[in-house]
């Protein structure tokens, strides 16, 4: 079954993240991700990202890539304005979907938490 999880970003951590990631850096990371490439630590620090934040981002993007490649993550990403994110998980139960979400390093570091969960049937 598929589950839609709507996550709520922590506004203070998001503000810090946006300060540490200029728009052009975020755009480059986003584009690489859309192209199927996970940037490594050297590439991120080369863009001026602190080594601590770069490691969290590498772990986050690697986690999502592994989930996607294994079929556990159907789709996902932040909503405009970084107040929420929407992820669609393939899971045997709601709890398993929650566990997949909470295993994300950004969730572990408190950048976001689950706001709502819905069982979902994909029709189109």
Per-segment meaning from a language model:
Residues 1-124:
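Conserved, structured core segments of small domains
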